Structure formats: structure tokens, C-alpha cells
């Protein structure tokens, strides 16, 4: 009984993968499928023109993103609350 349930589940998974593959025309199908299954996005290394929260910075150079400010004490970007 356990083997029958396992085979039925494996068949459904295989049917899902084959159906998804037939609709996909991209060459990066395995990566796309794994990222959808595990909800993991591939890091593409997009560069920003500013530094985000926790990034090291130099006070006075205005390197941090909008709504962030460089901390004089810790030398990293923090959220600017406006005093």
C-alpha cells in the first residue's frame, strides 16, 4: 500500500514537471524550476548607486541610499528618522 501511494505521488510530480517543461521555452528551465520550488532567487549581483542599511560608509560623503544616513559613531548606514 505504501509503495502504491509513493508511485502515485511520484507520477503526479513527474506529470507536473513534464507539463511545466512543455510550457517553458527558456533554456534555464532547471534553475527556474528549482527557484520556484524552493522560493530561492538567484543572486544576480545588481549594483546600486547607494549603500543600504548596515553597509559601511564614510561620514559626510552622502553614500547612503535615500532615507538612510551615515552614522558618525559606527561608520555604517542607518535609517534616518530626522531629528
From Swiss-Prot:
Coiled coil: none annotated. Keywords: Amidation, Disulfide bond, Ion channel impairing toxin, Knottin, Neurotoxin, Presynaptic neurotoxin, Secreted, Signal, Toxin, Voltage-gated sodium channel impairing toxin. Expressed by the venom gland. InterPro entries: Huwentoxin-1, Huwentoxin_CS1. Residues 1-21 form the signal peptide. GO terms for molecular function: ion channel inhibitor activity; sodium channel regulator activity; toxin activity. Disulfide bonds join 50-65, 57-70, 64-77. GO terms for cellular component: extracellular region; host cell presynaptic membrane. Residues 22-48 form a propeptide. It is found in: Secreted. It comes from the Eukaryota. The keyword Disulfide bond applies. Its main location: secreted. The modification Leucine amide is found at residue 81. Pfam families: Toxin_12 (PF07740). The keyword Disulfide bond applies. The presence of a 'disulfide through disulfide knot' structurally defines this protein as a knottin. Monomer. Belongs to the neurotoxin 10 (Hwtx-1) family. 15 (Hntx-3) subfamily. Lethal neurotoxin. Selectively blocks tetrodotoxin-sensitive voltage-gated sodium channels (Nav). Does not affect tetrodotoxin-resistant voltage-gated sodium channels or calcium channels. This is Mu-theraphotoxin-Hhn2j 3. It comes from Cyriopagopus hainanus.
Amino acid at each position: 500500500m505504501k509503495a502504491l501511494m509513493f508511485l502515485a505521488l511520484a507520477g503526479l510530480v513527474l506529470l507536473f514537471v513534464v507539463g511545466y517543461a512543455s510550457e517553458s521555452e527558456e533554456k534555464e528551465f532547471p534553475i527556474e524550476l528549482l527557484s520556484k520550488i524552493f522560493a530561492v532567487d538567484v543572486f544576480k549581483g545588481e549594483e546600486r548607486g547607494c549603500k543600504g542599511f548596515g553597509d559601511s560608509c564614510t561620514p559626510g560623503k552622502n553614500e547612503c541610499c535615500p532615507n538612510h544616513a551615515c552614522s558618525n559613531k559606527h561608520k555604517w548606514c542607518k535609517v534616518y528618522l530626522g531629528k
